[in-house]
């Protein structure tokens, strides 16, 4: 399994002959190494409906005939735009040919702001547990710290956790360090920082808050192998 980070909250997983993208916000992402027009994917997983997470989903999905897996409301909304979707909800798991997806709770919000100043409710925000090849990745999406992260860690043997550290809209570094402890992941990678001024952070400072060898700040385009 190959896992790559592409700035903000964009994660790519290559496993079982498939390419899975999580939260493909590329156009307008000041930290990414990708060009949306060149991105290939078989599956897109979405944590919630904010623009900096849905991003280029529709374009990428249509061009690649990719399946989009998201919460029911968000999946329904995207299906109306001609995208193949599979709707799920928090606590539910589903085994696909590329791996198993389970949605967890997240403490955030989820909605799309239209050009005519309307807000479309798109269901609850989530984190994602993805399991394939005997490895489990937890992408927390956008969230504050919550005590059930302990339960997530107890119920799942997490190999890699992607945790937001930007503050303002999500956990900051200190709370994310507590989350890392509760989750008990073997490796913790910071996400959702330095894309916009309100979420400016030093990822190495976050890494320094964790036990030696647990944290690793990936540069956009950098990969790890499991």
From Swiss-Prot:
The record's Gene3D superfamilies line, in alphabetical order, gives:
Ribonuclease Z/Hydroxyacylglutathione hydrolase-like
The UniProt entry's sequence similarity note says: Belongs to the UPF0173 family.
In which domain of life is the source organism classified? Bacteria
Q: Does the keyword Hydrolase apply?
A: yes
Write down the species.
Geobacillus kaustophilus (strain HTA426)
Question: What SMART domains does this protein map onto?
Answer: Lactamase_B
Task: Extract the Pfam families matched here.
Answer: Lactamase_B_3 (PF13483)
InterPro entries associated with the record: Metallo-B-lactamas (IPR001279), RibonucZ/Hydroxyglut_hydro (IPR036866), UPF0173 (IPR022877), UPF0173_UPF0282_UlaG_hydrolase (IPR050114)
Q: Which UniProt keywords apply?
A: Hydrolase
Know the name of this protein?
UPF0173 metal-dependent hydrolase GK2750
- Respond yes or no to whether keyword Hydrolase is given for this record: yes
- Which HAMAP family does the entry link to? UPF0173
Q: Which GO terms describe its molecular function?
A: hydrolase activity
């Amino acid at each position: 399994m190959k896992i790559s980070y592409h700035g903000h909250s964009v994660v790519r997983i290559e496993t079982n002959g498939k390419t899975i993208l999580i939260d493909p916000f590329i156009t307008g992402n000041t930290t990414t190494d990708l060009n949306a027009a060149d991105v290939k994917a078989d599956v897109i997983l979405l944590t919630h409906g904010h623009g900096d997470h849905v991003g280029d989903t529709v374009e990428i999905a249509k061009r690649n005939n990719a399946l989009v897996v998201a919460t029911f409301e968000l999946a329904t909304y995207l299906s109306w735009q001609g995208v193949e979707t599979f709707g799920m909800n928090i606590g539910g798991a589903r085994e696909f040919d590329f791996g198993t997806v389970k949605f967890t709770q997240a403490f955030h919000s989820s909605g799309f702001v239209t050009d005519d100043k309307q807000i479309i409710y798109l269901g609850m925000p989530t984190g994602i547990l993805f399991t394939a090849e005997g490895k489990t990745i937890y992408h927390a999406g956008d969230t504050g710290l919550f005590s059930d992260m302990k339960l997530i860690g107890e119920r799942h043997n997490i190999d890699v956790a992607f945790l937001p550290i930007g503050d303002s809209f999500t956990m900051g570094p200190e709370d994310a360090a507590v989350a890392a402890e509760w989750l008990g992941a073997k490796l913790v990678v910071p996400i959702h920082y330095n894309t916009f001024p309100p979420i400016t952070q030093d990822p190495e400072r976050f890494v320094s808050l964790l036990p030696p060898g647990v944290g690793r700040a990936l540069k956009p385009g950098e990969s790890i192998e499991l």
